């Protein structure tokens, strides 16, 4: 493998690159493994190591099975502010710890480009009015000034860091519009080196970039920290599922409908931990942004990525969004040289399994009421709603009266409290947003208007999206229906919906209210604590549902309203014409629009520019701060790690069921006034109206550890029927807040464990879903299965992930959570756990014992090294000190 590099001539420029063609069998690898192979060839420290890792990858890839451990070093890291601020807080703490261990604090600095976009903090406090955007931005800045000052310090004090100020857009949309290069270049030894653009991000929807041919995925903040500091990510060579796309979409169907179809099909298939990539002649009918919409939904079916190869559609998008012709020529030449150019057939590529989706069979869809993969055909949405009510034992005849502007209205289960056109999932694709605007214009012409109990929210993913709607002349119709832009950020998609209308809040416990949004997540309790049912769909359908004000509606048979002439209006009468949308797209979605939207990307408004923080090696902590505090992760840390010991006489903190999401474990939304976190804030002089959200408080471990397992919708079997963040304290027999019980156990030096079912840790790449439990004293989590990112996060924080053996679970073992649990010691000194299946003894209250074995889900030697060190940050800190 001597001379791993070669020269690629593009026009008058010569590029050094690392051809995968040097490796036998490369042409049969899936596209995604080709990217990993190039990464190995380029970054391995010597030929021997490169040959070893390349052989592992190729052997696994050609077998279609999971392979051995390889290393992956992403070209860059993407952050959003909720998960990014804790990262830079950790860096600040690590700098201090580095000094204490005798090292240079400047060693704690990102080694690769890092972009942080402030998109998670804006809340739809106001909506449906002309001043909503201005007022929400002012409120956002007022609440978050302290956090933003910290980010200004981070930008000045760390190299390789760029921060996009608030009010610009969503990180994933800006990533494909502005940051992603598809092929990157750098100067090295007076040569220009070309290589695949790759990334990891601290948001689970990072795979959005897969749609334009950029391999990347979501990781927890702690894993992203290590990657930013130059630590390779280790992973087993994954199984790769090929999705063959055939046919083309019918005119009324959107990319969101395809995304929901993917989520349903692939979650049923079971692709957790797999790579997914798309091929087939159906790709030719999908634009780059439609592909990005599909890729955005990746975490909702559990795969690591959903990659599309590069083709002319990719180049068209790069051209549209302002990349130079020289760079576009490089992308084309490099993709073709590396076998990454779209081959519609791809029959020679080896996949673990091939699934097929006929795009012409996709129908208009919604998904809900609490899982993105529970797809429903719109024509059967009314029947599905009736079934959901029956399953929940809801009286569909029940009504409640509300007074709206002097008129009495009767509402029943399924009444819409929120209709939100929001999220990078759909705003990325201009055709979907234009379709929503056309439907709004048609509805306006027919005399239709959203019901007065619906809070209407429009949150474009970037300034370009609003500019396109404006250029098409559709913003006036949207505003007339109450869809005023109220923020350029994630908003409802992450639960920043703000308060629902007061009279709706008053009846939230009497009937099950619903929300409808064009986002990617609808988990229980996520969109609003007052809303019990959440549904996902395309932007046009969001507006359509706002016009009828309920999920209890059949668009096929029920009229949405009556025109002035007495004729009935059905959805089919106002649905956008595909040819008109295409004309508007061609006319209004232009390079000039994207160029204007990209001007001053990093400058911010006057409020942002006025923030002043000088660079310094260490951060000056404010002891009075309730937003940014020094966490105790490294207190008492020694240069050499202590070997992990057996976990003896542990108590069960929670006993939960299937599909416990990271939202359940560490909520991002509002802080309940009766919660331990609220008590802490009030004790520190913070009034209820200034609580902000858990997500905004992630720089303060005191708030976040009190917020662990505090989701108001959490069901814990130990809480004796009490819903929310409650558990039983077996030391005194009381039902109390989870944090209060955990604190009591910690005072008695009693370790804690969690019992769970399938898919534990699904959802967001939330490192606080591991940090919070760790600070509460949780040492291990037992589950039937773990979602990929959360399992990594647990290891990264020194929590042991233990999986029940096949056919066993909490119920089959007869566990109820009252047991005292002992887990035998495990040796990690050689990397992989020894034993890989550990003995566990659960002692019941009557003294009887249940003995069983659990699989230690520490899958690679590197993960073992992290756990041996007490966590990934401790490992990295020791290596840099």
Regions found by a protein language model. Give the residues of each.
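Extracellular/luminal Protease-associated
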Residues: 279-286, 520, 743, 747-787
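Mobile "lid/hinge" segments at catalytic clefts and subdomain interfaces of large enzymes
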Residues: 188-335, 341, 432, 440-452, ...
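Long, structured ligand/cofactor-binding scaffold of large enzymes
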Residues: 45-248, 255-260, 364-367, 375, ...
């Amino acid at each position: 493998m001597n001379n791993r590099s070669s020269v690629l001539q593009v026009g008058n420029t010569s590029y050094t690159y690392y051809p995968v063609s040097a490796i036998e069998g490369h042409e049969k690898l899936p596209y995604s493994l080709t990217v990993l192979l190039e990464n190995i060839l380029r970054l391995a420290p010597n030929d021997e190591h490169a040959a070893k890792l390349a052989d592992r990858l190729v052997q696994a890839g050609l077998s279609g099975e999971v392979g051995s451990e390889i290393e992956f070093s992403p070209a860059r890291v993407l952050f959003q502010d909720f998960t990014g601020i804790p990262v830079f807080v950790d860096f600040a703490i690590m700098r201090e710890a580095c000094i204490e261990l005798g090292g240079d604090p400047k060693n704690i600095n990102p080694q690769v480009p890092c972009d942080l976009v402030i998109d998670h903090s804006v809340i739809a406090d106001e909506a449906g009015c002309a001043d909503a955007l201005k007022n929400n931005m002012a409120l956002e800045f007022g609440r978050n000034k302290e956090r933003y000052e910290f980010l200004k310090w981070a930008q000045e004090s760390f190299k390789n860091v760029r921060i996009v100020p608030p009010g610009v857009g969503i990180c994933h949309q800006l990533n494909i519009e502005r940051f992603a290069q598809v092929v990157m270049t750098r100067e090295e030894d007076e040569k220009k080196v070309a290589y695949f653009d790759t990334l990891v991000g601290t948001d689970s929807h990072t795979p959005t970039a897969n749609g334009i041919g950029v391999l990347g995925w979501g990781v927890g903040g702690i894993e992203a920290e290590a990657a930013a500091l130059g630590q390779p990510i280790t992973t087993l060579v994954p199984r790769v599922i090929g999705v063959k796309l055939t046919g083309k979409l019918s005119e009324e169907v959107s990319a969101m409908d395809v995304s929901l179809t993917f989520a349903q099909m692939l979650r049923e298939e079971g692709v957790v931990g797999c790579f997914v990539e798309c091929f087939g002649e159906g790709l030719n009918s999908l634009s780059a942004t439609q592909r990005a919409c599909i890729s955005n939904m990746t975490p909702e079916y559990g795969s690591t990525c959903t990659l599309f190869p590069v083709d002319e559609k990719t180049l068209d998008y790069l051209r549209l969004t302002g990349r130079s012709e020289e760079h576009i020529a490089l992308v084309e030449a490099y993709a073709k040289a590396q076998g990454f150019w779209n081959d519609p057939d791809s029959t020679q590529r080896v996949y673990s399994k091939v699934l097929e989706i006929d795009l012409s069979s996709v129908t208009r869809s919604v998904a809900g009421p609490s899982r993105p993969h529970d797809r429903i055909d719109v024509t059967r949405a009314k029947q599905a709603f009736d079934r959901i009510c029956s399953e929940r034992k809801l009286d569909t005849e029940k009504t409640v009266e509300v007074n709206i502007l002097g008129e009495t209205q009767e509402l029943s289960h399924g009444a819409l409290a929120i209709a939100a056109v929001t999220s990078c999932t759909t705003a990325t694709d201009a055709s979907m947003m234009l379709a929503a605007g056309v439907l709004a214009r048609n509805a306006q012409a027919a005399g239709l208007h959203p019901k007065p109990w619906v809070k209407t929210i429009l949150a474009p993913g970037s300034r370009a999206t609003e500019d396109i709607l404006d250029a098409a002349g559709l913003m006036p119709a949207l505003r007339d229906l109450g869809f005023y832009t109220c923020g350029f950020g994630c908003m409802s998609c992450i639960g920043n919906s703000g308060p629902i209308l007061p009279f709706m809040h008053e009846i939230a416990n009497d009937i099950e209210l619903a929300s409808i949004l064009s986002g990617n997540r609808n988990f229980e309790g996520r969109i609003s604590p007052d809303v019990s049912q959440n549904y996902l769909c395309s932007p046009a359908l969001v507006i359509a549902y706002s016009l009828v004000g309920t999920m209890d509606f059949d668009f096929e048979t029920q009229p949405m309203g009556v025109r002035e002439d007495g004729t009935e209006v059905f959805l089919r009468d106002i649905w956008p014409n595909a040819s008109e949308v295409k004309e508007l797209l061609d006319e209004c979605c232009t390079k000039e629009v994207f160029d204007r939207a990209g001007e001053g990307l990093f400058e911010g408004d006057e409020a942002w520019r006025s923030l002043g923080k000088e660079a310094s090696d260490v951060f000056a902590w404010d002891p009075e701060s309730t937003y940014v505090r020094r966490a105790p992760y490294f207190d008492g840390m020694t240069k050499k790690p202590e070997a992990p010991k057996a976990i003896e006489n542990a108590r069960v903190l929670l006993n939960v069921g299937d599909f416990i999401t990271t939202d359940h474990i560490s909520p991002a939304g509002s802080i309940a006034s009766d919660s331990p976190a609220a008590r802490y804030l009030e004790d520190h002089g913070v009034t209820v109206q200034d609580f902000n959200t858990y997500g905004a408080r992630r720089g303060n471990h005191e708030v976040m550890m009190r917020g662990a397992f505090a989701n108001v919708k959490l069901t814990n079997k130990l809480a004796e029927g009490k819903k929310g963040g409650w558990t039983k304290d077996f030391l005194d027999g009381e039902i109390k807040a989870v944090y209060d019980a955990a604190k009591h156990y910690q005072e008695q030096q009693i370790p804690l464990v969690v019992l769970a079912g399938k898919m534990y840790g699904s959802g967001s790449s939330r490192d606080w879903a591991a940090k919070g439990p760790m600070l509460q004293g949780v040492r291990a989590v037992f589950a039937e299965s773990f979602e990929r990112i959360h399992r990594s996060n647990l290891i990264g924080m020194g929590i042991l992930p233990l999986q029940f053996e096949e056919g066993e679970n909490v119920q089959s073992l007869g566990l109820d959570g009252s047991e005292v649990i002992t887990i035998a010691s495990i040796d990690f000194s050689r990397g992989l756990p020894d034993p890989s299946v550990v003995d566990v003894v659960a002692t019941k209250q009557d003294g009887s014992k249940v003995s069983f074995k659990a699989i230690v889900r520490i899958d690679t030697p590197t993960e073992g090294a992290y756990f041996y060190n007490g966590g990934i940050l401790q490992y990295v800190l020791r290596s840099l000190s």
